[in-house]
Amino acid sequence: AEEVDASDVNDIRALIRKAAPDIVVNAVDPRFVMPIFLACEEEKVNYMDMAMSLSKPHPEDPMNKPGVKLGDEQFAREANWIQNGNYAVVGMGIEPGMSDVFARYAEDELFSRIDYLAVMDGSNLTVDGYDFAPSFSIWTTIEECLNPPLIFEEGRGWYTTEPFSELETFDFPEGIGPVECVNVEHEEVVLIPMKVKAKQVRFKYGLGAQFIETLKTIHTLGMDKKEKVKVGNVEISPRDLLASILPDPSTIGDLMHGKTCAGTLVKGLDKAGKPKAVYIYNVVDNHWSMKNYGNQAVVWQTAINPLIAMELIANGSWKPAGINGPEWFPAQPFLDLIVEYGSSWHIREEDSKGIVI
């Protein structure tokens, strides 16, 4: 093991030169995507991540127009990667990642026309002793939930809306049940329209009413701010302070109960031209992942995807070049390996008329 400053490009470059890897897998906070990405570009080494470069709001109209979108900084440099003969596979976790693979599978195998595609994430996870304990980084939770959500529509392109907009209750499978979901900024809304033809794409997060109200309160109090403020003789970011107070998600697995679900809801016409709607999903039970792997459900559900992707690249099933998302590649080889890796994926038929666009 080596210690490295993930914000320092030169520090990361030195570690790459020392380790001489075939690929660098970035599994750290999205704040550090660009330093690691740039270090790999400069050292001409392949790269993979599970979240993309951060967005920046539109300077005049952030609730209607996107500014710098998630991943824009990375895709802007694709010519350099092609020239170097290297690849970067971006957004290769669970969401983004497996959810994008589901979208590609839906287009290839199930639909002749996609009218609506929504990545729907939800869980019934609880944590003993805590009323509010996010199952992954609170820094990232705040970033994606309080930024203006991104939506894609054919003919209009990408646009934004108010945080927590379009509340709906979605019935998640395998006993999770109904959870309140809202629009959230997420990488799939950038990646999927680049390769999958869909009339509308969005991401809806099953936060639940209490979680939503807590995040709204955090925002109202200014505790979501990234900029440092002076407290006595010390300067600290309110968001960093909040992250230090809340429990570390990697340490709460034994206290967690329930299941987490990641999936892609698709509505359109099937290959015969008839109305069709499905929810393609993956569910992980926290008791199962802790018992078998010693990792909580959200962590395990995320971590297997870059491993599967690297195996597919190694055996030639996926052939990345330049900067690619998961939907750049055939879906079936990935889905086959999900089962081999001890997990599963399922298709639930939905009522096409019940999905209002």
Q: In which residue ranges do the predicted regions lie?
A:
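Redox-cofactor binding/interface segments in oxidoreductases and associated redox assembly factors
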Residues: V24-N26, M48-D49
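Short gly/pro/ser/thr-enriched loop/turn and capping motifs at secondary-structure boundaries
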Residues: V33, S53-D61, E95-G97, N124-V127
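Adenosine-phosphate binding glycine-rich loop
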Residues: E73-N124
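C-terminal catalytic/substrate-binding lobe primarily of soluble NAD(P)-dependent oxidoreductases
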Residues: D108-I357
